Amino acid sequence: MANNCYNWASIEGSKEMLDLFELRLEEANKEQSHLWWETYFAVLGKPIEEGISYEVFGSRWFHADWERQSETSGVLNGDSAWSPVSEFFRKLSEVYQLEIESEYEECGSDFGGWYNCKNGEVSKDVCTSYHAFRFIQEDTEFFYTLLADIEDDSSWESIDDMDSEFIALLSETQKQELIEAFNKSKNI
């Protein structure tokens, strides 16, 4: 079974292009609940090509949920298989002349990141560890939730097993709090 990668994208564009995108997405979703090889192409309004879905779209499937926010904006989110649908977002931005700001996360495979594009051009493509991503997104709220989780039941054998990208983002005080929570969980 696939690890699900959660994708969230804020999309802006002209009313006409968003109307066309929305229509094509609705048609593709009538056939099945997930976008697959053929339906990715249907949403893009392009003929089916040869290729491997991971390379062409970023993921094998995408359970796309669309919510229109205004005439010129909306949110597209949902799970995909193993990896983000960044390349699909880039293609959407190119076909429909959209500006897309997206985030993705997958705790099981330990990554999260940001991917932005406009009119087919990538402006941001940053991937980091899952804990680092969550800390950057939520700062102290995530940190203290993690501390409570560690104190209750830590699956790490030693503090050295923790994510070094995440640890590097912490202040010295936070590092000390993390060590104390870890030691408490291990009764050290």
Feature names for model-found ranges:
Residues 1-188:
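Intrinsic low-complexity, intrinsically disordered or marginally ordered coil/linker segments
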